[in-house]
Amino acid sequence: MSLFEFTDRVGRVSPSATLAICNEASALESQGVDVVDLSVGEPDFDTPENVKRAAHDALDAGKTGYTPSPGIPALREAIAEKLRADGLDHDAEDVMVTPGGKQALYEVFQTLIGEGDEVALIDPAWVSYEAMTKLAGGSLTRVDTTPYGFHLEGALDDLQAAVSDDTDLLVVNSPGNPHGMVYTDAALEGVRDLAVDHDTTVVSDELYQQIVHDGREMTSLGSLSGMGDRTITLNGFSKAYAMTGWRLGYFAGPAELVSEAGKVHGHSVSCATNFVQHAGVEALRNTDEAVAEMAAAFERRRDTLVAELADRGVDVPAPEGAFYLMLPVAEDDQAWCETAIGEAHVATVPGSAFGTPGYARLSYANSTERLLEAFDRLEAHDLLTAGV
């Protein structure tokens, strides 16, 4: 019998599936097992050298104390400049700097979602959207894009049927985790029309904005007419700049929202790490070439994987951005993933964790050699074509 009485809200939430698989892979590796880890959403590149130097310089200059809670002025202004370049009308006062993108999402949900409030998700959806909704006391309505190859445009009628005047928040993620699709302007305009018609606030998670394939350009939802005052834009430094462990993210929206969210921020994390924020300024201002090189490498891997899977009898929708691929697997995707890691020693994440059973998410943030090794192992255990 437990000594503790846990809250209902925590009881509604399951541990992160992505972190659970990552921990299992690490445990096997500690026993000497060679695991090809395709579960983790982490670039396999090092942080750009100039960003690391900026952090060192900030440390040497004594930038180790508290900062203003919303972030240092230089970083907030650099973020605002980036957002304005994306077509959003934001000043530095509209920006909250957070220790990671998850914290940004948490603060927004805690500020906007109360007991019983409705949040609409577009499946497959990143695992933490559901958890953040439940932690805030909200309820979920979900729209599945799987029948449309994970493209939102085909699912707009379904989304229209799901979103109503009772929908308090709609979450849009493009390029998407776990599917890698980049939503078209027509799809985003459809979201805009629904949001305006139902007076619904939209969270636009743009964490993978700079990792797009085939020369695509991603439209920021908040730049569309009618969306500036009803969109909260989330972004961060983990993926594009290979800064996962630095824990630096941000959100931007109407000043009133940022001010209210500041209460959650101030009473939970106080501020993001001082010297890391200075490194963030350097990342925004002087890493275009490094970011482009990483994005190009991800695109080459995408091309190799999609072609290799086709050669082995598996057709998959080609990801348009980010660095994830949804592989069709057995109906019981969780059992498939357990077999994959337990027998083939390949770590993946079950699609059911994202609201899409029958699939496994593979991250191609790994070397081409290791990715092909993973396919060989899965094929040797009759797992690669299990969902065909």
Name each region found by the language model:
Residues T47-Y66, A80:
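Glycine-rich phosphate-binding segment of PLP-dependent enzymes
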